[in-house]
Amino acid sequence: MKVIVSNKFYYPRGGDCVCTINLEELLKQKGHEVAVFSMQHPENLETPWSKYFPSEVKFAPGLGIIEALRRPFGTREVRTKFTRLLDEFQPDILHLNNIHTQLSPVIAEIAHRRGVKVVWTLHDYKLLCPRYDCLRNGLQVCEECFSDKRKVREHKCMKNSALASFLAYKEAMKWTRMRLEAVTDAFICPSRFMADKMVQGNFDKQKLNTLCNFIDIAKTRKDDYDKENYYCYIGRLSPEKGIGTLIEAAKRLPYPLKIIGGGSLEETLRAAAAGSDIELLGYKHWPEIKEIVGKARFCVVPSEWYENNPLSVIESQCLGTPVLGSRIGGIPELIDEGKTGMLFESGNAKELKARIGQMFATPFEYRQIALDAQKRYSAERYYAKLLKIYTSL
């Protein structure tokens, strides 16, 4: 088959980008012809298809802001360049990932009109929530926009800005559920939780497929699964990730905690962790992540938003490291309590503190956790299910 894989960014910027790049490589390995459609960016990977990428847009005051504000609604440049790609490549399938704002769903409409089958992997809740993360103002879990998109304006959910929230509302009103559903042949939800939310948002259940993300298993393989006496966190240092709750619990405990990542709360957390056995390590590359997470007794994923299918859980388990996760979003689906980790109530520092102690006291079969996870999240397993979706269209 000939497949166009599309994502707004084409470099390892976040989980959606990593999944897109992994998907491209997997399809090529399986003998499919693959083209890429993304936005121009100085950090993009090299590809012969970049000649069709629309220009980079930046949502900041200055030159190009008008084009940036128009882009979410489907601009002439995006339409023209994507049409040229279709003319040259003649795909069977367009596989969308994270395309809103910088590319827009106009490419799904163009492909659909040409008879190209459209598959869309959903990495966030943008089709339900104009903010994409189901967080009112980035702080409080909220589902009001599932049924009434005007709520994004009422609560000023976009940067607490009336203008930004109005634009998000207009974008949602252009790309309505009925419009997107009409041009999409299959949606892929990486978690059952997301699929349930899509049903709650009145999307056609017959078009929803649940398929957990995969990772490059080879990079997680180890010779030994020996552990050291510390636990860890890996991820963005921002409020919705629950890192503040983790620090609150960890400060009251005698166990060393290693934190990998950066973000808006970094300096605040450094001040809060001063004098404790909490170490903020900043950003790390994979070899260091593999070493730190792989030797940790367990990894904590204390999220306070609707995590979909977090790579932090998947990668930790593939390294033989159990996970202590919050009971929210798609996290519980990935953890077999007592066997591959434990769960706690999201945002509950008291319960988290107790669970940390229990995790240190519980003997886990680290090697078995790794072997089972490497099977569950393998490219082979993912591809077998993806191919069934492709061939059913």
Regions found by a protein language model. Name each.
Residues 7, 11-13, 25-76, 80-89:
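N-terminal strand-loop element at the rim of the active site
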Residues 127, 146-220:
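Donor nucleotide-sugar binding/catalytic pocket of nucleotide-sugar-dependent glycosyltransferases
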Residues 188, 219, 223-254:
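Conserved donor-binding/catalytic core segment of Leloir-type glycosyltransferases
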Residues 267-291:
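Nucleotide-activated donor-binding/catalytic signature segment of Leloir-type glycosyltransferases, i.e.
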Residues 313-314, 328-338, 342-343:
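Short acidic/histidine- and often glycine-rich active-site loop of Leloir-type glycosyltransferases
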Residues 361-391:
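A charged, aromatic-enriched C-terminal amphipathic alpha-helix characteristic of glycosyltransferases
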